[in-house]
Amino acid sequence: MTTEQRRSLQAFQDYIRKTLDPTYILSYMAPWFREEEVQYIQAEKNNKGPMEAATLFLKFLLELQEEGWFRGFLDALDHAGYSGLYEAIESWDFKKIEKLEEYRLLLKRLQPEFKTRIIPTDIISDLSECLINQECEEILQICSTKGMMAGAEKLVECLLRSDKENWPKTLKLALEKERNKFSELWIVEKGIKDVETEDLEDKMETSDIQIFYQEDPECQNLSENSCPPSEVSDTNLYSPFKPRNYQLELALPAMKGKNTIICAPTGCGKTFVSLLICEHHLKKFPQGQKGKVVFFANQIPVYEQQKSVFSKYFERHGYRVTGISGATAENVPVEQIVENNDIIILTPQILVNNLKKGTIPSLSIFTLMIFDECHNTSKQHPYNMIMFNYLDQKLGGSSGPLPQVIGLTASVGVGDAKNTDEALDYICKLCASLDASVIATVKHNLEELEQVVYKPQKFFRKVESRISDKFKYIIAQLMRDTESLAKRICKDLENLSQIQNREFGTQKYEQWIVTVQKACMVFQMPDKDEESRICKALFLYTSHLRKYNDALIISEHARMKDALDYLKDFFSNVRAAGFDEIEQDLTQRFEEKLQELESVSRDPSNENPKLEDLCFILQEEYHLNPETITILFVKTRALVDALKNWIEGNPKLSFLKPGILTGRGKTNQNTGMTLPAQKCILDAFKASGDHNILIATSVADEGIDIAQCNLVILYEYVGNVIKMIQTRGRGRARGSKCFLLTSNAGVIEKEQINMYKEKMMNDSILRLQTWDEAVFREKILHIQTHEKFIRDSQEKPKPVPDKENKKLLCRKCKALACYTADVRVIEECHYTVLGDAFKECFVSRPHPKPKQFSSFEKRAKIFCARQNCSHDWGIHVKYKTFEIPVIKIESFVVEDIATGVQTLYSKWKDFHFEKIPFDPAEMSK
């Protein structure tokens, strides 16, 4: 077996683990596996299940050195009936298996219905081609000994591991043949991505149906129907609706062709208003002329949501709708797609990039631009970059026609304004940025709006912190000791950061760590070995300080147990990695205090008063209304996990079924939720059965379609006035409540200031709406001219690339990685390094999430090879036929060879060196 095959097997092991039950192929692997290894694998399956058994099987498999075992493994898969897995490994193409994931998600969701409605013995013969022979025998045996429901559960387990690409369709046919009612739920023609949650819910006899284009519940516009929402048929879902009067009021200025900001509360149906405007706009063109609409969504989940909404709404009109996001842009000809479609849903950076490249020559190609969450149009946000282009075209006297501009928002905001005049200026500046001459709000149909949008009652709860905090005392002592060790290595530690008077367990301390780490990355000494030793040591000390600081923040807001578990996980990972002398010393110091920390965290007297108050609120609200649906907003992902664990472990809250919703995280970190995971959670939350409380970070603030809830809790969570209005707007049901729970009086004060600013914003909008339109336009033009003058005066000439060769050093240990002369650029944005010398500088490990993107297949992660460093440098990919590393500049320090000056860059675009395109011919040298 070649090294490449071994690496590929490691890279794709997640697919194998999810599919293979190794006990079915062990008999075929007898020539290569020892008897005790076979027993270990069988025991692992019996104790922990097939996935853990597959993990152990792969471990033993990859340790084999005998000739021919890889072919033996493939033959074993073939003989046992794993034809799909065999084909995928033979070609190293797992696309067919990956496509099954959406059906697995659907089956998991429908599992309770499946178990109660399916009689496995009726359909097993029709499904035999989708299952392993041994699986069929086991299912029939379980049906015989334990009953049909247990057999159905086993059938689900087997289908979830099936590698046959046709199993979803085969299951459908088998169900239809038996006239089983479950076939109505099992929709395979389009897959779960295209199946409306509402259809499933309707057939599963739940009553909380959301109309397909729903940004908010009011989008149903079912006021004209006499039947309740649960009785609305599929035909009604996609037929034309009669808009409410307040929606027509919001749409009217835009329908008259005016550039408009539509400012209306979350829950009123702004998405539906945008559909009305778009439809009116496209229909107004005479024969032979056509409009072209672009709708901008700022976040990928919102983009996916709106693309689906527009596609379904306009398919009955014969308009062509498509979408391009950052995830798909590399694989599509943007210019052609824009040219060939009537409505294009975009993430804004796509248009910014293509305007720069010239693939889209100007905004004149569009006739209408709609900006969702348009309050973001400021500073260097992509929305503003698009509007800079628009305003340059407008003020530069370009002959090309400009598109109409529509902005949608729940709150225009007031920035840092302290009075109505300053708020007025801020709003005028936003109008100037969007070239809007009208702010549309509901004035004449307020009563109707108030019947649809329910403003929740707001409550502030100030809770005392723990009276004494032994946990914090112990951790603070460990942090002081760690700081002292760092000062022994670097006596100038205090001078590496301008931040003074830092306090443990605060955001300010986190900022101090960041500035110290940046400073030590460019710290220089004549003795380079000593420089490397000091920089690496400081990096380790500050990394441990960061984890201690995180733990203090978790303890302050959750349980001491959660904070301690966080630290135990960290030190467990430290032991599994390089574990040099410094890490051994720091780990030993922690372990010396571990027993005391365990004792403190178990002491009932150390319960967090904030959690006790949160528990009281939840008990009280669910007692008053057992059907309560809650969103609990928190600041960090770590706190999301901690509060979920607390709820699940609290017998007083056994009535709660928590789900979590967090952002996607950084691409170079294994944190955050994937888009499918976010969608799955939101669908489950809307179903009002799988989860009755959603614990969320700020990702739930803005734009994402979240079902009605009647309780919003802001747990130490506050932002600006826009964030306040959006989070409060999540409480959409009649009689909803919003609690702000905090131990910090300053948080309550900030929220009260936000409430004052909201009133100031509303008053300012009312004042603006009384202005003469010509006067307002003149004001807007003055701001635009002034802002363009400032922009032009600040415009910098395009930097000249530096042709001098430079070193790239590992940011953690300062080891030489490569020279810029060896760096090559692929497709203008990916950076690889040529030459065998660089290969000796890194080690590879299987990527936890291998996947295909554009012309690349992500296979492994690469790390600094220097002993006890292992700093993350990037990834190893297959590009066309080449196996190459792809590095990220944020992992390196750039050193000028001539002067020795060291510089940090967070993005390649900021590093102006001579960028040589990748040439395949160089790979053969």
Curated annotation (Swiss-Prot):
* PROSITE patterns tied to this protein: HELICASE_ATP_BIND_1 (PS51192), HELICASE_CTER (PS51194), RLR_CTR (PS51789)
Q: What induces it?
A: By bacterial lipopolysaccharides (LPS) in endothelial cells. By interferon (IFN).
Mutation: K888R; reported impact is: Decreased ubiquitination and function in RIG-I signaling pathway without effect on RNA-binding
So what does mutating K154R actually do? Reduction of ubiquitination. Reduction of INFB induction
Chain residue ranges for the region called Mediates interaction with RNF135: 735-925
| Residues the record lists as Phosphothreonine modifications | T170, T770
Chief site of localization: cytoplasm
What residue intervals hold the motif DECH box? 372-375
(Microbial infection) Deamidated asparagine modifications at: N495, N549
What does altering K849R do? Decreased ubiquitination and function in RIG-I signaling pathway without effect on RNA-binding
- List the GO molecular function terms: ATP binding; ATP hydrolysis activity; double-stranded DNA binding; double-stranded RNA binding; GTP binding; identical protein binding; pattern recognition receptor activity; RNA helicase activity
List-wise, which residues carry N6-acetyllysine?
K858, K909
Name the catalysed reactions: ATP + H2O = ADP + phosphate + H(+)
Outcome reported for the amino acid change (mutating K788R) = Decreased polyubiquitination. Loss of function in RIG-I signaling pathway. Decreased ubiquitination and function in RIG-I signaling pathway without effect on RNA-binding
Query: What result follows from mutating S8E?
Result: Complete loss of MARCHF5-mediated degradation
Q: Which GO terms describe its biological process?
A: antiviral innate immune response; cellular response to exogenous dsRNA; cytoplasmic pattern recognition receptor signaling pathway; defense response to virus; detection of virus; gene expression; innate immune response; positive regulation of defense response to virus by host
- Which Pfam families would you find in this protein's record? CARD_2, DEAD, Helicase_C, RIG-I_C, RIG-I_C-RD
Q: Which SMART domains match?
A: DEXDc, HELICc
Q: Which residues carry this modification: Phosphoserine?
A: S8, S854, S855
Q: Which residues form a coiled coil?
A: none
For the protein in the UniProt heading, the enzyme class is hydrolase
Q: What does this protein do?
A: Innate immune receptor that senses cytoplasmic viral nucleic acids and activates a downstream signaling cascade leading to the production of type I interferons and pro-inflammatory cytokines. Forms a ribonucleoprotein complex with viral RNAs on which it homooligomerizes to form filaments. The homooligomerization allows the recruitment of RNF135 an E3 ubiquitin-protein ligase that activates and amplifies the RIG-I-mediated antiviral signaling in an RNA length-dependent manner through ubiquitination-dependent and -independent mechanisms.
Entry domain remark: The RLR CTR domain controls homooligomerization and interaction with MAVS/IPS1. In the absence of viral infection, the protein is maintained as a monomer in an autoinhibited state with the CARD domains masked through intramolecular interactions with the RLR CTR domain. Upon binding to viral RNA and ubiquitination by RNF135, a conformational change releases the autoinhibition promoting further homooligomerization, interaction of the CARD domains with the adapter protein MAVS/IPS1 and activation of the downstream RIG-I signaling pathway.
Which pathological condition is tied to this protein? Singleton-Merten syndrome 2: A form of Singleton-Merten syndrome, an autosomal dominant disorder characterized by marked aortic calcification, dental anomalies, osteopenia, acro-osteolysis, and to a lesser extent glaucoma, psoriasis, muscle weakness, and joint laxity. Additional clinical manifestations include particular facial characteristics and abnormal joint and muscle ligaments. SGMRT2 is an atypical form characterized by variable expression of glaucoma, aortic calcification, and skeletal abnormalities, without dental anomalies.
Q: What is this protein called?
A: Antiviral innate immune response receptor RIG-I
